[in-house]
Amino acid sequence: LYLTNQENLSTVGNYKLVTSKGEKSYLQLPDGTKVWLNSCTTLEYAENYGHSNRNIYLDGEAYFEVAKNKDLPFVVKANGIDVKAIGTAFNVSAYMEDSQLTTTLFSGKVAVQPTLTKQEVLLEPNQVAVYDKSRNKIEVVPYDKKLFAQWRGGFLSFEMMYLQDITKLLERNYNVVFRYENQGIKKLRFSGSFRNNEDLSEILNVIKTNTGIRYQILKDTIVIK
């Protein structure tokens, strides 16, 4: 994890926190909000955070336990969605390269709003808002407690996730590159949970058994067939 203080504000925040591949980190924001960052995640916030607003900007995945402040809602702006909360616990997965963005609510209430449509949905605990970027559509589904946000405990978990998003997640955790020979299988879905120190070939074998894909490992590149 590294933290920078941007004197000349050229992006969205004065403070930027970044995790690298395979790295996870914890921090506490000035208002007492607790944040856990997953691998390859960038979080930014301004110097006036906690005074005039509680806006943060996220590219990647983070779990939040939000300090209560009814006068200043906590807002996560994340690659096409805004998530607003007052005091609650939730997870946002919003990597720039992923086809779907998810917000998972564990306690309290949050409002999730795509920036393009302004179609706001309200989540209750044990619900997930899934935003499909290609269709510009958001839907609310129940979540499996065994799968969501387990990355904080050292697990890689997928819940009906597209294969193309699973391989992006594996790239971030295993420092490899996936290449597809068959583009049509990117939309295959898979659910499962693995320890994040599990051998990559073991994970791929389980996915292969359940989806019928084939793969070949060429040093740091995995070819999906």
Question: Which residues fall in each region the model found?
Answer:
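A residue-level detector for the "anchor" residue at the start of short, highly conserved motifs
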Residues: 1-225
